[in-house]
Amino acid sequence: MIRVLVVDDHPVLRAGLEAVLRTEPGFVCVGTAGDGHELLAALRHTRPDVVLLDWRLGDEDGLALCRTLRAEPAPPEVVLYTATVDPGLDGQAEAAGAHAVVEKSADIDDLFDTLRLAVRGGRQAA
């Protein structure tokens, strides 16, 4: 089972992603967080394989949180999740240690494929 921690400042989106993850074989949502403080607290007791992290997390910077996560001992993989298309984001995300960037409008199967690849250590094709 791939253990996913969902981090987004919108409660409805968090709940929706948690529900969708419950329906997909091979995935389990081990927790959710609405901000960076909740993320770091949840990280320690959920031990996810991958964190699905909103790029624009309220006033917080998802890239900075990604760097913080990657500095943890035994860090989880990170997939940035965004509603905003930004041509420079892929490079910034990779530099911050994220596995990939997925648009919130992407097909759910593409999201699942990206999460699987992240855990296996593969890179998403550009």
Please describe what each predicted stretch is.
Residues D35, D61-A64:
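Acidic catalytic/metal-coordinating carboxylates
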Residues T32-V50:
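Acidic, metal-coordinating helix/loop segments flanking the phosphotransfer/catalytic sites
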Residues G88, A106-V119, R123:
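C-terminal output helix
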